[in-house]
Amino acid sequence: MIFQSFLLGNLVSLCMKIINSVVVVGLYYGFLTTFSIGPSYLFLLRALVMEEGTEKKVSATTGFITGQLMMFISIYYAPLHLALGRPHTITVLALPYLLFHFFWNNHKHFFDYGSTTRNSMRNLSIQCVFLNNLIFQLFNHFILPSSMLARLVNIYLFRCNSKILFVTSGFVGWLIGHIFFMKWLGLVLVWIRQNHSIRSNKYIRSNKYLVLELRNSMARIFSILLFITCVYYLGRIPSPILTKKLKEASKTEERVESEEEKDVEIETASEMKGTKQEQEGSTEEDPYPSPSLFSEEGWDPDKIDETEEIRVNGKDKIKDKFHSHLTETGYNTSNCPIYDYEDSYLNNNNTGNPENFKLQLLDKKNENKELFWFQQPLVSLLFDYNRWNRPFRYIKNNRFEQAVRTEMSQYFFDTCKSDGKQRISFTYPPSLSTFWKMIKRRIPLLSLQKRLPNELDNQWISTNKEKSTNLNKEFLNRLEVLDKESFSLDILETRTRLCNDDTKKEYVPKMYDPLLNGPYRGTIKKEFSPSIINNTSLENLKERVRINRIHTIFLPNTDYQEFEQKVDTVDKKPLSTEIDEFLTLINEFDNEPKSSLNLKDLSLFSDQEQGRVNSEKRTKFVKFVFNAIDPNGTTSEKKLIGIKEISKKIPRWSHKLITELEQQSGDYQEGVPLDHQIRSRKAKRVVIFTANNQNNDPNTKDTDTADQDQTKEVALIRYSQQPDFRRGIIKGSMRAQRRKTVIWKLFQANVHSPLFLERITPPLLFSFDISGLIKPIFRNWSGKEGEFKILESREEQTKREEKKEKDKKGENKRKEKARIEIAEAWDTIPFAQIIRGYMLITQSILRKYIVLPSLIIAKNLGRMLFLQLPEWSEDLQEWNREMHIKCTYNGVQLSETEFPKNWLKDGIQIKILFPFCLKPWHISKLYSSRGELMKKKKQKDDFCFLTVWGMEAELPFGSPRKRPSFFEPIFKELEKKIGKFKKKYFITLKVLKGKIKLFRRVSKETKKWLIKSSLFIKKMKKELSKVNPIVLFRFKEIDESNETKKEKDSLISNQIINEPFSQIESGNWPNSSLIESKMKDLTDRTSTIKNQIERITKEKKKVTPEIDISPNKSPNKTNNIKKFESPKNIFQILKRRNTRLIWKFHYFLKFFIQRLYIDLFLSIINIPRINTQLFLESTNKLIDKYISKNEINQKKIHFISTIKKSLYNISKKNSHIFFDLSYLSQAYVFYKLSQTQVINLSKLRSVLQYNRTSFFLKTKLKDYFRTLGIFHSELKHKKLQSYRINQWKNWLRRHYQYDLSQIRWSRLMPQKRRNRVNQSCMAQNRNLNKWNSYEKDQLIHYKKENDSELYSLSNQKDNFKKCYRYDLLAYKSINYENKNDSFICRLPFQVNKNLEISSNSNTSKHNLFYMLGNLHINNYLRKGNILYIERNLDRKYFDWKIIHFSLRQKEDIEAWVKSDTNSNPNTKIGINNYQIIDKIEKKGLFYLTIHQNPENNQKNSKNDFFDWMGMNEKILNRPILNLEFWLFPEFVPFYNVYKIKPWIIPSKLLLLNLNTNENVSQNKNKKQNFFLRSNKKIKNRIQEEKEPASQGEKERGSDIENKGNLGPVLSKHQNALKKDYTESDTKKGKKKKQYKSNTEAELDLFLKRYLLFQLRWNDALNQRMIENIKVYCLLLRLINPSKIAISSIQRREMSLDIMLIQKNLTLTELMKKGILIIEPIRLSVKNNGQFIMYQTIGISLVHKSKHQTNQRYPEQRYVDKKNFDEFILQPQTQRINTDKNHFDLLVPENILWSRRRRELRIRSFFNSLNWNGVDRNSVFCNENNVKNWSQFLDERKPLYKEKNELIKLKFFLWPNYRLEDLACMNRYWFDTNNGSRFSILRIHMYPRLKIN
């Protein structure tokens, strides 16, 4: 057995070795390359298919194989690779060859010299076949790019050690694949030839010569195929002659760019060659070995060695080098007399300025650019890497530099030492490698002998060990100090920061601190005012000048002496004003990436400031300080030589491209081609305003005035409404190759990115509403009509309204679409705009001067004919009023006479103001009532647009509107007159009718008398004949009533059907058959009743004689009984029964159908579900309706709430009959239970305490309820059942954060999930022993507030606590499996027993939150939760889902307010609270104001605790997406207030109106020195101001940290306000007094403070104001008045006070009156791309908070040392040393800061002795490495009850370490190349720590 296993193991290892061997891999990759079938296979197929003899076939295959062999060899052999891989050679070879081949195939007998049969090898055609196959095989990868498979061999060659073996095996693999392919092809061809069915095809038989023709034209077919493939491939990479060549940047291009250009050329040409050569170590000489001459480091002082070396080499060597370089890069050396320059350069060595030569070279290069195309060499014509052939984006950088080349490789391969081994690095600096080569050439090889690899290894290992031991020592020392219980923050390693001022303890702002990295690193903003420049910038300048001085010593300059004097003045005396001014000027350039100054720019600046400073001095100063201007004054610029930044040069395009729009608007800078290259969206620049400043001076030329006019134009850009297929494509690039705008249909109207295809709405066929179909059927068939009536009527009503609105919207959309289509059609058809323009103008003239006057004349003549007074004056007045205003194509008004610019090309609209409407008469008494209507109409339609056919349209290209008819009022008048005539006529008729009626009445009365008498006679006859039946009749009556009662009873007793069937049925029949059905029912019923009564009376007499039927006993009874007894009667009874059955069959059928329906249908569609659905829908719709109408009253709210309750009750009543529990969703049960009040839960006690399987609640749900604390504590089990579900899911389930609505999930950003987990940690972060020491703590905090120096430490500690919490959470969630000791896996309520008791005893009976509120509302509002608004954006809103309110109001709110855990249960809550809430309920408004003046506000703070936020708006005005809130409208105000700016509102202000009496006196004291700088706090705040405002926003989270004492709260807000005032002052350089009014200042402050708000008008704004704005806009010729007004207010262009009638309205009053509405902008505005990126990649809060340790001295967070433990989460089970005050660090590494932490981890992993080579990855193989970690925590005290338990100590990876580090480790250190191993990496990065 052992022997077998041994054999098996050997076999497996052998197999593995074979599989991993180079030969097998080579065979595999070679075989794969067979599948990349390129056009080269066409020739092979041609030779096989065309039967031209075996010789040709053989020659074709041999040619094919040799070609492939050459390709494989070229991969390995560098010279061959260069020959075939050089694009120039292939281009030169391929194009003529293809052309020649094409002609040769077309003219068959072109090369027939007569075949010599002696030796077939000499036959030219056979040789050609061989050559064709050979050459085409070589082309395959270059001019005709094939698929990726062909390149696999090249790629794998890099990783392989024995390369020759790999190449040969690869070729063999390809050969095998090729043989298989050829054999298969041969089989297919033989099958085609032999297949009878193909030959016997009808079509082939009818065309006898078809096969022959095919065979003859086979060559032609193949040549066509070849041509198509060539065209296809050239389509993918276009031929260089056909594509458009972009113009280079202008002649005066900066030298930097030209250098870069050369760089790129050198890189592209040399890259392929260089890499292979270096790897193989081939000794071939480099054709141009020093690209460093033209590389980025160029001629820096550091590179003197290189230049020296070149000088030593002498003239010849340099000539060769330069010559080779220029030929390489494609510049014709014959046109460039380089040698002379070189001679002069070498002869003038003593001058020592090598830049001269470089400049001359550049000039020559630019000259070359100017040459005509035929003067340029062929290669550079055919192949130019600068062509923009692929559709890349052109991403503009800034005005100094060109766009970055994305497709250029930025890698440079070379060998270097890494981890003690020689490895290939792809980011090796090219200059270094070339420098190394030069040294190798100069120094003898013996001295450069490599050391042995072992030496290297050993050295590296030893250094690494040394470093890691040092680190370990330091780490252990820190831990030991911690263990000695002397905790201080010095143990923690913190980040060093730059300090601005030691005395004031100010740091340099984060943004500018070079020692900090992260999102704060940024460029310093440009500032132009001289006052801002402080000492530091002067210091920088001095330093800069010193460096330049050093530079001039190295490169002596003629201006040196002057320069030195100038420097002395700079050093000795303060800068003169001119220099100071100049600095501000330079500043702008200084902050751009280092580049050159432009002389023209300077002259521009000097022109502007000519009055103050002499421009000559300035330019001199530039000359000396920056050495930037040539002494000769030429425009060729030099590089700014300043402090060299460590940066990598990026390959850039040599073009500066501009878009069409830029060309049209003239926004581009100088030195840019005038023609556009980027195709932007179809647009037209419409000039709407030109200010012609006519110049009276006769001396000025026309050109100047033209320029002036150009600058004074105001233009809009009008985009076409068509889909934009251009998307910024560059001219000459291939549109079909774009990735993101794919065209996948034959005809595609809109362009879509494939990413968003799912968003496109599917066709209507596939989407239909099933429930919508079922509902009406159910309603029509069920007998429940009565119950649905209320709901149905409302639902129908809302549906009808919705449908109307939908239809209206749809109609509007359709019209709009049609309008746009028409406009686009006019725009696209050539010459359409010209035709339309002329037509419009002719129509306008016709209308104004021909049609309307003629109509007026006709009308008035008609009036005169009808003997009416003519109305000439009125009509002419109206006609004069009509104005025809010329507008742009967009509809922007110009004037009556002024035509828009280029109107024939761009289009024109003609707007008719006060369009003339012909009326039959003007003022009449008849129309006095309609006067108002007409006025309204007039106001509405006082303008229209003229259409091409002379009609009027509401909008440009709209459908023509209906004009009021001229004859309509005339006809109406006629109708009225006819009506009057009719009235008179009818009066006469009435008189006649009255007389006729009298006659009729007399005749009727006589008739009646006759009938009565006849009836009387008949009656008498009947009475005499029949006496007995009368008694029976009486019986019948009584019986009938009894029977109906019975029937009714039976119906009532039936619970399922509440109404008689007949009634239901009749209700649903159509109207036509209604009367018939009723009649039928009636007759049926009466007859059955008769029969039944007869039957019952007789039967019962017979069978049961003892029962009396009637109360009156008749003497005839016995006779009757006798009658029944006879047999004849029995037969009659049977007969009657049959008839009765027949009669009853109708009802039986009905009943049966109903039964069927009830059993089948109702079991499927159960009533409770539908009831609830209807209920929810109807309430939602009702609420929607209220929202839309904007009418809300308290009554209505109450009404809704009552409806809610009543409807719920109804649904409960109805549903209990058909209660099928399986159809009730868990969510529904949960929802209902959560809605019920606490008291009602006692009814469910039995259900909840029922321990077996419960019917109503699933066990999961039950447990969930317990977790949430919905039940009373009595109902909770002491021990929960252990879950047997996956524990992780379980853990998630217990945290409410994961129970989110769809809307919430959609809003989540990448970080939000993490934040939710973090919040859950905070939820448990309370120790409740301190509950009663609340007030005492508050006082302590308050006292300690005054001396802030002590609290920098506590501030740090506070930060550290946060870090601790996150660590704890991470630790807990990972250790979830260990259930007994983990804290989070237990319920918070179990641990916090105190909380339960205290909350039950201290809060009121109606506890609104139940147990839940105690925890979760505080989770949102307590200390330390809202840490940084930047991080926790999702904390901006309350999560109302976790609060289950009841529908009560006052008491519940009181309870709610009280149940805040941090608040003292003894705190007094004043009556104000209720007043405010009532106010909100009654009026539906927020009464909230901004602090007008902080001083006044202190006094009134008690009253307007809800007011200071400045929101004033109707509740329903705000669109709230989530309709959940409308189920509880009472709480919307709270939500809205909090939503505005939660990180500013203290948590108490939101819910509590605190008692302020105790603190009033202190506040008064504070008030007095509020604006004095003596107050330390304010000092601190002012210090904070020095950090930028955005930073302030980030850090303002600290404001919410107050414990509830109103004193600090208020002062803090005053400080904040103060800060904002000062901020705005410093920013604008203004004082407060400069504001014209309070309103303006307030608005300014508001917009500054609440950056997330935008202003919006209310629609009902003052009419006069709108008109003024319209006038204002008409002057500017703009469209939308309200938008412009708002923007102008925000920009301070328009004053608020001018617009308002009342003076000095405050902002709140403005909002109260509804003039201004302030809307919150959604938070997404805040997150720019960089921030979101940082969210995903960056360091987490743990990290960040620790690095801010020393950052803000004056941060106002105070922690009492005694309460230090309070904030650390240490439950009783997990408390370690309850009496100690230090932290037990969960993650000991946190002592070190991040970079050192990383180093420690990595070093401890480098167990270097096990590393045998690059391919071996021992980190994952060797578990022993992990044990190194046990030493860190060897002597720690036990954290748990059981000792020696393993802590799985893992960090969350993403927050703590940056992605780049991870990727680097992943890729190079641990030798994994994809992301799939990240998980392995995680495990090994965070190993276990053992505790002894």
From Swiss-Prot:
It is a multi-pass membrane protein. GO terms for biological process: protein transport. InterPro entries: TIC214. GO terms for cellular component: chloroplast inner membrane. It comes from the Eukaryota. Belongs to the TIC214 family. There is a partial copy of the N-terminus (positions 1-337) of ycf1 in the inverted repeat (BAE48059). Involved in protein precursor import into chloroplasts. May be part of an intermediate translocation complex acting as a protein-conducting channel at the inner envelope. This is Protein TIC 214. It comes from Nicotiana tomentosiformis (Tobacco). The gene is TIC214.
